[in-house]
Design a protein with these regions (language model features):
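Extended, charge-enriched "interface" segments that sit outside catalytic cores
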Residues: 1-69, 341-345, 349, 437-445
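Glycine-rich phosphate/diphosphate-binding loops that line cofactor/substrate pockets in enzymes
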Residues: 59-73, 126-135, 253-263, 314-319
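Short, charged beta->alpha transition segments
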Residues: 62-63, 120-128, 251-255, 327, ...
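Glycine-rich phosphate-binding loops that contact phosphosugars or nucleotide phosphates
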Residues: 65-241, 427
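Short, solvent-exposed amphipathic alpha-helical segments in soluble enzyme
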Residues: 92-95, 127-130, 154-156, 189-191, ...
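Active-site phosphate/pyrophosphate-binding segments
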Residues: 162-324, 329-332, 417-445
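Helicase-primase coupling helices
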Residues: 299-385
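C-terminal helical/tail subdomains of lipid-metabolizing enzymes
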Residues: 378, 384-445
Length: 445
């Protein structure tokens, strides 16, 4: 279960203002629950935890078992934005940090990602890896025409067909796409690919608990049922029309701080396994709130590492910051610090302490220092990193994002600004139909 602690904000806001913002958050929650707000045709994510059928997970497990029987030891997941960040976040959080370097036979394939950039070096080096491995691919796109994943898929599809033959390739490629339309759906039907559906009413950044995230997480060997259970408990908790609703608490405080001049929110973690939670969170809030000249700018850091780079700015820089700290109460591993008779490093006072105890005290000390430096602290805690708690975090942040966007007065479920770079890129690449725009752009260069 996710717990919210706003004590680190008490010296920056007063109770009356907070209560007023709670009322605003509850009003926004009502709009979300009654589906009467902007973007209400993209609310299919709200009940995914409680309504996802077990047969969907079983289908994903069948893909896993089929590929295991073929000896597949490398799966390339192709997608961008919400089509890869949720799965990447889950796999990074749940996997052994050095799983790909440990000796011994792996029980699950290595999962790598493509289609989230246009780097020629990246895709070429990925191909180098594929040539040494037994490969399969998951391509994720509603349309099949998004440039980055479409380019990567064209190259990877050609490689798999050339290596294994067209018929076998059709059993090594799975598509997650629209149910009825789009280039990828048409190609999948033509080639005979197994497909999973992205529903029309779920946007990419809210799709981690659909086949977009579920399939790669199952392929990675993790317990999606536990993840959905954690998310389902948060679905219930975050629907409550009361101040005890954790999503309401978080949305209310971050909007109050925003209106008080804190325009940048930094998501802080103290475990490198959660680095990609920050990347997923940045897309979720950046695309949902950054529009109409409004929005909190989302950033992320990994402490204690980034205390030795960004720590100086956070402590002493411009006072436009707030921090949301992800606290993990218990470690999944245990290691104590040994005594050293020479004590040249002066650390014998730590003898017998767990490394995680040092991490916890670094977290507490940093919170207090940053409060003293004028940076409010919102704390989000979970008991440990596992599937259940990760599912709870996913749903908590999604629900709070919808509430927060409505409080801000924007549509949290569209992303019109994303099209601007695409139009320029298409024009500069010579896509038919963009000739006039290309001419205008080239005059500026």
């Amino acid at each position: 279960m996710v717990k919210v602690n706003l004590g680190g904000c008490s010296s920056f806001v007063n109770d009356a203002d907070y209560k007023a913002y709670v009322e605003k958050a509850l009003a926004a929650l009502d709009v979300l629950e009654t589906e009467t707000g902007a973007g209400n045709d993209f609310l299919g994510w709200k009940h995914l935890p409680s309504q996802t059928p077990d047969c969907l997970i079983s289908e994903c497990e069948q893909v896993r078992d089929s590929w295991k029987a073929k000896g597949v030891d490398l799966v390339v997941v192709i997608g961008i934005g919400g089509s890869y960040l949720g799965a990447k976040c889950a796999l990074e959080a749940l996997s052994h940090t050095f799983a790909n370097s440990l000796k011994g036979e792996r029980s699950v394939p290595q999962i790598v990602f493509a289609g989230h950039n246009l780097s020629e070096e990246y895709i070429s080096e990925l191909m180098d890896l594929m040539k040494e491995r037994n490969c399969a691919a998951v391509v994720i796109s509603k349309s099949g025409t998004t440039t980055e994943p479409a380019v990567a898929f064209r190259l990877i599809k050609q490689y798999i067909e050339q290596t294994y033959g067209v018929k076998e390739a059709s059993e090594r490629i799975v598509a997650v796409t629209d149910a009825h339309r789009g280039a990828l759906k048409s190609l999948s039907t033509q080639e005979g690919y197994k497909t999973f559906v992205i529903e029309d009413n779920v946007g990419g950044r809210f799709s981690v608990l659909t086949p977009v995230g579920i399939l790669p997480i199952v392929l990675g060997g993790f317990d999606v049922r536990a993840m959905l259970k954690g998310a389902a408990e948060m679905e219930e908790a975050c629907a409550r029309n009361c101040e005890c609703n954790p999503a309401v608490q978080y949305a209310a405080m971050r909007n109050l701080l925003y209106d008080n001049g804190k325009k940048v929110e930094i998501l802080v973690s103290y475990n490198p396994k959660l680095q990609y939670l920050g990347e997923w969170w940045k897309q979720l809030y950046g695309e949902s709130e950054g529009k109409d000249g409004k929005g909190i700018f989302p950033a992320s850091v990994s402490f204690t590492t980034d205390l030795h780079s960004m720590g100086q700015y956070i402590q002493d820089g411009m006072r436009m910051l707030m921090e949301t700290v992800i606290t993990v109460e218990n470690s999944n591993r245990s290691m104590t610090i040994a005594n050293d008779p020479q004590n040249l490093d002066g650390l014998n006072f730590l003898t017998g302490k767990h490394v995680e105890e040092c991490n916890a005290m670094a977290e507490l000390g940093t919170k207090l220092a940053h409060i003293d430096g004028g940076v409010p602290q919102l704390s989000i805690s979970v008991e440990r990193i596992n599937e259940y708690n990760l599912g709870a975090l996913f749903y908590f942040f999604e629900k709070a994002c919808g509430i927060s966007g409505y409080m801000l007065g924007v549509n949290p479920f569209d992303q019109p600004g994303v099209e601007a770079y695409k139009k320029n890129m298409f024009a500069l690449l010579g896509k038919p139909g963009y000739e006039e725009q290309a001419k205008a752009l080239k005059e500026r260069l």
